[in-house]
């Protein structure tokens, strides 16, 4: 057990992933998950996916730098492991960006955004960020292990306060799986979208 210096160390592990998730949503409002120009080339699905993900991740790195700089130097948040906090926060940003890229690519811009907002609402109530998940209704306790923000909160709580045990490495493994799995699905979807059909060449008219 590690000692927290104040409320900041207690609430930061919840609000930092929340900010990163919302930041990822805004990023994909500004950028195309699958660039149209890349889809029109013979590039593989992975290259098309990375053509969308890399610029988004660059914005994610900038967001992490600004966010951690503000909470540490501006608000005085104590970081027991600065390197660990930076590295883990970058992993969280990558996982959230890849997950949202995948949802938007697979479901489409409109349905994808609805799914992202629904996922955000579920994670706010079930991640155990502000109070123990054991005190929440049974539904939220049941979905807690299946939502990425649960592991983002747990991992950040450990690297910020200095408690490094198996839960941190489980969180790293799960978020890495989310990031790589999402990128793989997006690459598959990009490959499918490069196959032109009559419906895509001649879309139905809506009056």
Question: For the regions a protein language model found, what residue spans apply to each?
Answer:
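Membrane-spanning alpha-helical segments of multipass transporters and channels
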Residues: 1-207
């Amino acid at each position: 057990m590690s000692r927290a210096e104040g409320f900041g160390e207690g609430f930061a592990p919840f609000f930092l992933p929340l900010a990163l998730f919302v930041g990822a949503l805004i990023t994909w409002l500004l950028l195309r998950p699958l660039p149209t120009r890349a889809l029109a080339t013979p590039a593989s699905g992975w290259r098309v996916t990375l053509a969308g993900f890399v610029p988004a991740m660059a914005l994610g790195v900038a967001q992490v730098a600004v966010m951690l700089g503000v909470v540490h130097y501006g608000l005085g948040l104590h970081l027991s492991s600065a390197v660990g906090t930076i590295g883990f926060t970058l992993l969280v940003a990558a996982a959230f960006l890849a997950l949202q890229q995948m949802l938007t690519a697979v479901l489409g811009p409109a349905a994808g955004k609805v799914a992202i907002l629904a996922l955000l609402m579920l994670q706010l109530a079930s991640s155990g960020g502000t109070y123990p998940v054991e005190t929440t209704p049974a539904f939220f306790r049941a979905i807690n292990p299946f939502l990425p923000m649960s592991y983002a909160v747990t991992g950040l709580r450990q690297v910020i306060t200095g408690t490094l045990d198996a839960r941190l490495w489980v969180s790293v493994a799960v978020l890495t799986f989310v990031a790589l799995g999402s990128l793989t699905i997006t690459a598959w979807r990009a490959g499918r979208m490069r196959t032109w059909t009559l419906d895509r060449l001649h879309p139905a008219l809506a009056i």
